[in-house]
Structures are given as structure tokens and as C-alpha cells.
Curated annotation (Swiss-Prot):
Record-given protein name: Probable calcium-binding protein CML9
Source organism: Oryza sativa subsp. japonica
One Pfam family, short name: EF-hand_7
Gene that specifies this protein: CML9
Keywords: Calcium, Metal-binding, Repeat
Single GO cellular component term: cytoplasm
Length: 155
């Protein structure tokens, strides 16, 4: 699976994996998978991570007992998630649906509601955090093209 990633992406995955491999045994706790993937800028929830992990370990890429995963399994999961990620243009087009006035601005509450009820659903807390990032002045509105840039730069 890693073959579909650029060398830069593989290097970034290695860097993140090594940060979480605190005892340097070549494995990270499966429970840290969500946090590690989010460190790569990937929006992933616990259920999705469990599915990815089950697929990776079933195909021989991980599980050494104790719920730990090796770099190959992590890279497999990261590659799968990264390939599913949307581009800036695709994200902007999705948010454009909420912009009836075609002003480039959408209500922050509408964005929050969309994040907790559609697609890869966020928790209320995660959605609140994203809205705070998107609307740092607390004006109740989000310039969605800038929000997309924030999302894409989290990688």
C-alpha cells in the first residue's frame, strides 16, 4: 500500500511513527493510532481506525500481541487514509453547498453541525475545536476557502 505514497509522505509517516514509538521497539500501541494519524493531518475516528487496523493486521501487517502495530501496519493504514483524503478543491466544493449567497462565507454553527452529522463524523468537542480554528474571532462565520487551507495545512 505504501507504494502509492510519495517518498515525502513515507518519510512523514516514519517521523510520526518514531515519535509515538517511545521505547524504540519498532511498535506503537494500537490505541495511539488515531492520535498518530491525526498528527499526519488525517481526520479519523476510533471506529474507522479499528477497521483500518483490523484490515492491516489481517493482511499480515502488524499485531505482535498486546495490541501493538509495527511500521508496516501503520504505513498501510496511513496510506489508505491519505488516499481517501480530499483535495482542497474537493473540500471547497463540498463547503460551497452551504454557501447560498455565494459569498465565500458560511455560518460557523452550520459548519459545526455538518461536521458532527455527515461523513467522517466528529465528536461535539472535535467539531467545536475545528470551529474555533475556523472562526478565531468568534464572529459566527467561516470563510470556507481559508478553512480548507487550515485543514490541508494540518498535514
Amino acid at each position: 500500500m505504501a507504494a502509492k505514497l510519495t517518498q515525502e509522505q513515507v518519510d512523514e509517516c516514519r517521523e510520526i511513527f518514531d515519535l509515538f514509538d517511545s521505547d524504540e521497539d519498532g511498535r506503537i500501541a494500537a490505541g495511539e493510532l488515531v492520535t498518530a494519524l491525526r498528527s499526519l493531518g488525517q481526520n479519523v475516528d476510533e471506529a474507522e481506525a479499528r477497521r483500518f487496523l483490523a484490515d492491516a493486521t489481517a493482511s499480515g501487517g502488524g499485531g505482535g500481541g498486546g495490541g501493538d502495530i509495527d511500521f508496516a501496519a501503520f504505513l498501510s493504514v496511513a496510506a489508505r487514509k491519505m488516499r481517501r483524503g480530499a483535495t482542497e478543491k474537493e473540500l471547497a466544493a463540498c463547503l460551497d453547498v452551504f454557501d447560498d449567497a455565494r459569498s465565500g462565507v458560511i455560518p460557523a454553527e452550520q459548519l459545526r453541525q455538518a461536521m458532527v452529522s455527515h461523513g467522517d463524523r466528529l465528536t461535539e468537542e472535535e467539531a467545536d475545536e475545528m470551529v474555533r480554528k475556523a472562526d478565531p474571532a468568534g464572529e459566527g462565520r467561516v470563510e470556507y476557502k481559508e478553512f480548507v487551507k487550515v485543514l490541508m495545512n494540518n498535514k
